């Protein structure tokens, strides 16, 4: 984070953009690509607010920690960070990312294309931007309200489950976590459905998004990553003051 902040010119006019979604929806990858295009932007990962391993809620039935509930995060610290950004236009330099993000190089996006996007959006996005990606951005109104622009990245259940299964594991503050075979269904998706149901028609997270202040970004396997990226950039441009 410190290196990202070196050239960031954030001011009190900084646009605070949330890029939320279920684990393996692709939100972190999209956020990482977007920050490469934006002229004056920095990226904050909610994953960096996870608690220590022994503080994560313990599930008695499955005898493992539950990393996918709000209580697994230090939400008070996260909210203070959002308030700090809103007050100063800049994230706290002390934040250090844990590196649990797929390499965006696998998409084969050329530097020429990224430069074309930079030229295209330079005149459309003039405010400094802080992007925040996370899996618990819109479960609580008081957290969601802190964002100037709220984007929700979606993908079908089966797609997200397959993506999650392909990951080797995750670095935590104290160790390395690998999903048990049942983890996506019983923890990841179950928690996402429970905490985000109110945003959808019939409280079904596979149904239509109906929350008026949250914009859907579809990122299924059939979606072209370049189109998804441009949709995010268009949404940020439209959210400017």
Curated annotation (Swiss-Prot):
The active site is at residue 47. Keywords: ATP-binding, Kinase, Magnesium, Metal-binding, Nucleotide-binding, Pyridine nucleotide biosynthesis, Transferase. One of its GO terms (cellular component) is cytoplasm. Gene3D superfamilies: P-loop containing nucleotide triphosphate hydrolases (3.40.50.300). ATP binds at residues 21-29, 163, 167-169, 213-215. Belongs to the uridine kinase family. NRK subfamily. Catalyzes the phosphorylation of nicotinamide riboside (NR) and nicotinic acid riboside (NaR) to form nicotinamide mononucleotide (NMN) and nicotinic acid mononucleotide (NaMN). This is Nicotinamide riboside kinase. It comes from Eremothecium gossypii (strain ATCC 10895 / CBS 109.51 / FGSC 9923 / NRRL Y-1056). The lineage of its organism: Eukaryota, Fungi, Dikarya, Ascomycota, Saccharomycotina. The gene is NRK1.
